[in-house]
Amino acid sequence: MGRSPCCEKAHTNRGAWTKEEDERLVAYIRAHGEGCWRSLPKAAGLLRCGKSCRLRWINYLRPDLKRGNFTADEDDLIVKLHSLLGNKWSLIAARLPGRTDNEIKNYWNTHVRRKLLGRGIDPVTHRPIAADAVTVTTVSFQPSPSAAAAAAAEAEATAAKAPRCPDLNLDLCISPPCQQQEEEEVDLKPSAAVVKREVLLGGRGHGHGHGGALCFGCSLGVQKGAPGCSCSSSNGHRCLGLRGGMLDFRGLKMK
């Protein structure tokens, strides 16, 4: 539950205070004191809220209020207190007897602030504006000497390092490791082209000195060494153009 309002707004007056209301408020406070501001309006016969009565008394009707302009000493004191306390006007007013916080705030915004700006002083920091501008323009964005020295040392160390593989040529073609093994196996086995060539050459007539020509029966393997064979004098029998000794595996020993 929030705090209840100090008055019923439907039955209170608003706006400027009249002379009669000021006289009633002053007469009641002189007779009974300030007391409780919530119950004071009803006791004094005023159709005002307690907050309105309090502000009217403190800011306008107090007998110890100072009237007139601020003096030079008060101006200096306000500037010094503002540099220490900032915009805490109630604390500043407590050190200026007879002056209210609202009065001091209005005087600061209308007179003192402009006076400080005219003197070249920042009203927030209370420092010379020219000095602040110089400090801003002299900001250097160059790297610190330690950082520059570290970067130079790192560059020298990188340049001093020798390459690990100076003779490495990345353009070389790398053959698969099984190529050499395949070449060896091909050398051990007779080529199919060689066998085919042997067959073709065996059926041709080059004379008896080169193996001789085979007859039709020997070339088909039907007759071997028959009396009518004209190629019986050749070394070994031929079948399909191959000598018989080439296909004879009886002399080989089984491992």
Curated annotation (Swiss-Prot):
Pfam families the record matches: Myb_DNA-binding (PF00249)
UniProt-annotated location(s): Nucleus
PROSITE patterns attached to this UniProt entry: HTH_MYB
Cellular component annotations (GO), alphabetically ordered: nucleus
Domain HTH myb-type: 9-61, 62-116
Chief localization: nucleus
Protein's GO biological process: regulation of DNA-templated transcription
InterPro entries, sorted: Homeodomain-like_sf (IPR009057), Myb_dom (IPR017930), Myb_TF_plants (IPR015495), SANT/Myb (IPR001005)
Single GO MF annotation: cis-regulatory region sequence-specific DNA binding
Keyword terms of this UniProt record: DNA-binding, Nucleus, Repeat, Repressor, Transcription, Transcription regulation
Keyword Secreted: no
DNA-binding region in chain numbering: 37-61, 89-112
Function, as annotated: Transcription factor that negatively regulates genes involved in anthocyanin biosynthesis.
Protein name in the entry: Myb-related protein Zm38
Species this chain originates from: Zea mays
